[in-house]
Amino acid sequence: MLQIQVEEKEEDTEESSSEEEEDKLPRRESLRPKRKRTRDVINEDDPEPEPEDEETRKAREKERRRRLRRGAEEEEEIDEEELERLKALLDENRQMIATVKCKPWKMEKKIEVLKEAKKFVSENEGALGKGKGKKWFAFKMMMAKKWAKFLRDFENFKAACVPWENKIKAIESQFGSSVASYFLFLRWMYGVNMVLFVLTFSLIMLPEYLWGLPYGSLPRKTVPRAEEASAANFGVLYDFNGLAQYSVLFYGYYDNKRTIGWLNFRLPLSYFLVGIMCIGYSFLVVLKAMTKNIGDDGGGDDNTFNFSWKVFCSWDYLIGNPETADNKFNSITMNFKEAIIEERAAQVEENIHLIRFLRFLANFFVFLTLGASGYLIFWAVKRSQEFAQQDPDTLGWWEKNEMNMVMSLLGMFCPTLFDLFAELEDYHPLIALKWLLGRIFALLLGNLYVFILALMDEINNKIEEEKLVKANITLWEANMIKAYNESLSGLSGNTTGAPFFVHPADVPRGPCWETMVGQEFVRLTVSDVLTTYVTILIGDFLRACFVRFCNYCWCWDLEYGYPSYTEFDISGNVLALIFNQGMIWMGSFFAPSLPGINILRLHTSMYFQCWAVMCCNVPEARVFKASRSNNFYLGMLLLILFLSTMPVLYMIVSLPPSFDCGPFSGKNRMFEVIGETLEHDFPSWMAKILRQLSNPGLVIAVILVMVLTIYYLNATAKGQKAANLDLKKKMKQQALENKMRNKKMAAARAAAAAGGQ
């Protein structure tokens, strides 16, 4: 009897099946113990086995595979020592994956080490789940990897969804951060207006369109008979009269019923609350952006080793696009120019007496310009009031649009004058920009408030006119009833007269001062947009074409002399954007469509102005870096928001709404819709509690507490900022002391070595 112990050598038939089973098991080959199996004892004298039938052979093959599978499972049992060693190796490789880009190695070595670490983790991470009690750990590791990948992909998705990011990066690389800050501000304003539009469209315009009474059902929703012939003309629609006036675009179209539609939607309440909500949201988002910028600004001075940081840390090694690399190169170059200009400006010696005289002269000219523009606005307002009393058919296009055109032209030419005056002052470019913005802001704010005062006079005239219209409507109704009764008296006894009916287009109506206010703001917005675009086409595009194609045959160099290419007017564009947004906040309560019109304006402005900057403008001769916190723009926006909402709140609280148009018709004041809702839709005890909470004494106390809290938080923030500055100074001083101590120790060691020799 010969016994043969055979070391396992997989045969062809067994090799394929065993490898298929092993591939399904994620394990590390090097950590799996070697295994040997002793086959059955083979006796050479035994007779050859009889041939098996098909069923017996299949049963034996199935049993063999079951034994192989069970053996593979037993083989996966790893002892505790090997398991701990594998965990340590996996943690080490994961740490290497996370920190390999920070290693001071060549790129080839980084890539090679990263590939090896990822391969090791992917091959051996599943081995931790083999054995009793380890599968839950493997599942957690797998889910952690999938969650990290999901977060990374989601961040990439959010970055890809940021609108106009590549356009703004290209502009920043060519023109610097100061010009790019305007487009970033424009994009932020686009997002704010998108939220305002969603609120007004979904809660005001859409419910009225779906559930309100259709056009022609009420006098407020019908074009008067005298205007029907010209209601659809382009000139009338461009002036937002005719069909545009009697639509959901303006305040007067909305019905004053408490509920509309099968959902019993409370439209007057929604209209009032959405108007207040838009104002509150605007304040909240501006203040939040300002606080975020303050947080991003850091705690103090951060200019230590400024040029060293720019030299060694500016390049992004993950860039793989040649165009992106060119933009990044230009951006780094522009950043160096900005930093060098900042450094030189801090070392320039100035003639203080000459500079003071020139600055006084510049401010004198600025005050003259502001006074002249104010007088011109006042004169235009007086003329517009005179034109309002005349027949509109006798007026020309300029006479109808004189007020809007004067304001647009002043906003276009006065910033250029202020820019010329700023050349006399010789401020640092960033400080000069702030002075220029402040002057243009004062100009536009004065123009806006003169416009509001003119509107207030017109509103008072409309309110007086309403009283006469009410009396006339009463007489008209009495005459109509009298005529109807007379027509019935002429009929025989058994004859029924026709029902009394008057078409809504024939009913007399009031002037509806709210719609008039909304129309004025919409017209001013549209005229401002058209003026801006025409200015870009004529002042930038045609000028650039003339300089580009006529420079070869001209007497002097047009590119470096007069007229040359234009520079991008940061101050004028920023103030125009802020001024326009102030008009949106002021007029959106009386024209719910105004945020949507402004979205179209901002959307087209982004593409149009980006094209104009890249094709028609040149970088500024005086390069400067924009502030890291954009709070100067936001501060002016917050001020214009406050000044814009004051007239609106005054109109809501003090002026009576029109009697025959708008959702608040029939009430003495617009805010009475809140009391009406409390009376009809809330329990009496809740209405009583809300009235007590609205007590002026309690409101004043809450406001005082809020003011004191804000003061305390502001003082705390200033103290923390001062503490951060002190800590930075101490750290710098400690670094200098350590440096001097190391130098002394090195000198002492050198002296000792020299003495020993």
Swiss-Prot record:
Region: Required for interaction with CIB2, residue numbers = 81-130, 298-352
Q: Which gene encodes it?
A: Tmc1
* Disease named in the record: Defects in Tmc1 are the cause of the dominant deaf mutant Beethoven (BTH). Heterozygotes show progressive hair-cell degeneration from day 20 onwards, leading to severe depletion of inner hair cells and scattered loss of outer hair cells, and progressive loss of the Preyer reflex from around day 30. Homozygotes show almost complete degeneration of inner hair cells, and little or no Preyer reflex at any age. Defects in Tmc1 are the cause of recessive deaf mutant dn. The dn mutant shows profound deafness with degeneration of the organ of Corti, stria vascularis, and occasionally the saccular macula, starting at about 10 days after birth.
Question: What happens after mutating W554L?
Answer: Reduced Ca(2+) permeability. Reduced channel expression without affecting conductance
State the compartments where it is located.
Answer: Cell membrane
Q: Where is the composition biased (Acidic residues)?
A: 8-23, 43-54
Query: What's the protein here called?
Result: Transmembrane channel-like protein 1
A GO cellular component annotated for this chain's UniProt record is: stereocilium
Please list the residue ranges that the record places on the Extracellular side of the membrane: 215-265, 385-396, 464-512, 591-593, 655-697
In terms of InterPro entries, this protein maps to: TMC, TMC_dom
Which Pfam families does the entry mention?
A: TMC
Name its species.
Answer: Mus musculus
Which sequence ranges are listed under topological domain Cytoplasmic? 1-176, 298-353, 425-428, 551-569, 617-630, 732-757
Presence of the UniProt keyword Phosphoprotein in the record: yes
**Reaction(s) catalysed (UniProt annotation):** Ca(2+)(in) = Ca(2+)(out)
Tissue expression profile of the protein: Detected in cochlear inner and outer hair cells and in neurosensory epithelia of the vestibular end organs. Also expressed in cortex, cerebellum, eye, colon, ovary and testis.
Q: Summarize the impact of N447C.
A: Reduced sensory transduction current
Please describe the quaternary structure of this protein. Answer: Forms the MET channel composed of TMC dimer (TMC1 or TMC2), TMIE, TOMT, CIB (CIB2 or CIB3), LHFPL5 and PCDH15. Interacts with PIEZO1 and PIEZO2; the interaction may be part of the MET complex. The interaction of TMC1 and TMC2 with TOMT is required for the transportation of TMC1/2 into the stereocilia of hair cells. Interacts (via N-terminus) with both isoforms CD1 and CD3 of PCDH15. Can form a heterodimer with TMC2, TMC5 or TMC7.
Q: What is the effect of changing T416K?
A: Reduced Ca(2+) permeability. No change in channel conductance
Q: Where is this region: Disordered?
A: 1-74
From the record, give the transmembrane residue ranges. 177-214, 266-297, 354-384, 397-424, 429-463, 513-550, 570-590, 594-616, 631-654, 698-731
| Keywords annotated in UniProt | Cell membrane, Deafness, Disease variant, Hearing, Ion channel, Ion transport, Membrane, Phosphoprotein, Transmembrane, Transmembrane helix, Transport
Write out the coiled-coil annotation as residue ranges. none
What does the similarity note say?
Belongs to the TMC family.
The annotated consequence of gene deletion is: Knockout mice show reduced transduction current amplitudes in inner hair cells relative to wild-type.
GO molecular function (one): mechanosensitive monoatomic ion channel activity
